[in-house]
């Protein structure tokens, strides 16, 4: 009897289990709530994209302008090649840390017309006007800024073989040869009246400023002078409509309008300090005063003609040449500032280029110091600085005051 009872119990139990697992209350894995760890186990693992390797040649991001820049700029000049050399940069930094110098002028567009660093300026890339010498311009700016050094970007404007090659329609033409005109050094120029040329150079200046350069220095902002002037045919400039001075004055104004708020400086011939005409190249120092923060006449004594101020060799008299030139310049700036008819957009100051190279005389420490002292003695303000030009980028340290 017990065996029969056990048999029925076993049958009932088996039927119950069968109904339990086949009922609508399904307890399969798919309906069991998952914990976070379970979600991770069940879900398909997504393999992350591999990190892009860091390009050792890549530059850092744009830099801010130097905080608290010096009120009186005392600069040395550097070619792009020197700026690309770690050893040379350390030389500049050491010179500045141990002397009164506090700024560096760096070539970003020299007489070749090529930009010295890679960039994304549309027309520059289109024209192939790049020769990378400075691989990391932003990093260079940071390195100099970290040392408290003011950094100026120098660019040649109308002397531009790279642009004349890409755009011969913008170039000065030779009447006799029916080719692109070149000066005595074999360098070609673009038409100073071309708005395309103006905009092209402004785009370059904007790029430099956006990278963190504290200032842009414009050189070769003039008409050509060294060559057969009678053989020049201008594709745009028309002497019947405008004088050369009017063209350059319009260009100066255009620069300021398109680079508002930027620190700008202009390199002018030294003779503009004493001449009342435009020297046949369109440069008149008074025209630069409304638009440039710093005007930089190149008062190299070796560049003055024999007989200047009674000197058979002006290069031997650096103090006299620089003092006389800067005194006349300062008098003209004072008259400009006192005029009630002038329109000023900036508080312009003089910051001349001085000679630190042997030409006409051996330029030792005494001659370097004489030029600097002449700048100070001629100025009516203590805010006048200077820039030293040494093509070798090797400077006469003893001509500078120690820190």
Regions found by a protein language model. Give the residues of each.
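N-terminal, intrinsically disordered, polar/charged segments of Gram-positive cell-envelope systems
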Residues: 25-71
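Active-site-adjacent "subsite" loops/lids of carbohydrate-active enzymes
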Residues: 64-75, 81-83, 158-210
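Aromatic-lined carbohydrate-recognition surfaces of secreted/lumenal glycan-active proteins
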Residues: 77, 150-160, 217-218, 224, ...
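Catalytic domains of carbohydrate-active enzymes, especially glycoside hydrolases
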Residues: 88-114, 210-215, 292-294, 375-386
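Glycine-rich, aromatic-flanked loop segments that form ligand/cofactor-binding clefts
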Residues: 103-108, 135-181, 217
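Conserved, mostly hydrophobic/aromatic
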Residues: 104, 144, 151, 201, ...
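Aromatic- and acidic-residue-enriched segments that line the glycan-binding/catalytic groove
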Residues: 116-128, 160-183, 224-239, 283
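Substrate-binding cleft of secreted/luminal carbohydrate-active enzymes
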Residues: 292-306, 315-403
